[in-house]
Amino acid sequence: MANDYLFTSESVSEGHPDKVADQISDAILDAILAQDKYSRVAAETLCNTGLVVLAGEITTTANVDYIQVARNTIKRIGYDNTDYGIDYRGCAVLVAYDKQSPDIAQGVDRAHDNNLDQGAGDQGLMFGYACEETPELMPLPIHLSHRLVERQANLRRDGRLPWLRPDAKSQVTVRYVDGKPHAIDTVVLSTQHSPDIDLGTLREAVIEEVIKPTLPAELIKGDIKFLVNPTGRFVIGGPQGDCGLTGRKIIVDTYGGAAPHGGGAFSGKDPSKVDRSAAYAGRYVAKNIVAAGLASRCLIQVSYAIGVAQPTSVMVNTFGTGRVSDATITRLVQEHFDLRPKGIIQMLDLLRPIYEKSAAYGHFGREEPEFTWESTDKALALAEAAGTEPVAALAE
């Protein structure tokens, strides 16, 4: 890669239609896990103008009012007016859940015992990533993209910009020099708004109140291109503007394109699904490797076969930044982390109703107490084993 290049990532707000679907799916998962932590859940959601469809496979002893959970989620997001195209009070909610296939269940149904050889719920490959670009050990473009739409939502909720509506998208382009962030090049922010705000007022307010307070001062160099609602009017949005589906924002959910993605979405899936749990474990491993000072950038890939507990492969790539060899780091990963599906569930305490919070503004790089995969509690042990100096601010 050239010494001087541009890299871009995007994010979307909690009111984006695909994120509405993700949050409903994870709210339903949480409601089920709160009653029956051994449930098997694959909850998919479709949302359109005035309509929500709940489908998928659920096997549980829990008694959940799925329709009310969906309505409560839509209300929390802010769709409480028919003018927005969907209103939690009046939208239709259709429920079409089935049970998990017994052919799949036979490989993973030992969840209740202490046998760590519970098989993976499906085949697949998952990636974890960490780097030193931010204190959270995340790539800077996706980190800033998340913070922009999160700030847009906060300003909407507290009434400082009362003409904002729930749907929004952000995109940040960063200039890199010698592989490190050097300056912000372009910021795009498109936000849904009420029809009575003029475009000039909107653009000035978004730049001054949303964008500028979010950008790191040391990366504001020269002329930054601010593109706010570049097509102009954005009144029709959310599920009215586009049909929303669970699992369509997998790059937003992870590393903004800075790392590969195995293709499996997260939301609506209980932790027996390695699409979710192994991706969380991958982040946990990669973050601890970087926090331990073993490398300044780390990618890990793991893969699984359905019904088989042990990963079919574990790969570590530090892109030439390793203080020890990638082979040594791979060995340390296998010694310090249990990457069997049930081992991951126990290691990260995943049988809890913690997932709705993850369904907007990124699953990674957020210091939420429930997000155990963001802990760097293995960093000191890894550093001691490898003979490196841990990142002092991160090693616990």
Swiss-Prot record:
Binds 2 divalent ions per subunit. K(+) binds at E44. ATP binds at H16, D167, A168, K169, R233, F234, D242, R248, K249, A265, K269. Its main location: cytoplasm. SUPFAM superfamilies: S-adenosylmethionine synthetase. It comes from the Bacteria. Its cofactor is Mg(2+); K(+). L-methionine binds at E57, Q100, D242, K273. InterPro entries: ADOMET_SYNTHASE_CS, S-AdoMet_synt_C, S-AdoMet_synt_central, S-AdoMet_synt_N, S-AdoMet_synthetase, S-AdoMet_synthetase_sfam. Pfam families: S-AdoMet_synt_C, S-AdoMet_synt_M, S-AdoMet_synt_N. The keyword Cytoplasm applies. One of its GO terms (biological process) is S-adenosylmethionine biosynthetic process. Its EC number is 2.5.1.6. PROSITE patterns: ADOMET_SYNTHASE_1 (PS00376), ADOMET_SYNTHASE_2 (PS00377). Residues 100-110 are annotated as: Flexible loop. It is an enzyme of class 2 (transferase). Mg(2+) binds at D18. One of its GO terms (cellular component) is cytoplasm. Homotetramer; dimer of dimers. NCBIfam families: metK. PANTHER family: S-ADENOSYLMETHIONINE SYNTHETASE (PTHR11964). Catalyzes the formation of S-adenosylmethionine (AdoMet) from methionine and ATP. The overall synthetic reaction is composed of two sequential steps, AdoMet formation and the subsequent tripolyphosphate hydrolysis which occurs prior to release of AdoMet from the enzyme. Belongs to the AdoMet synthase family. This is S-adenosylmethionine synthase.
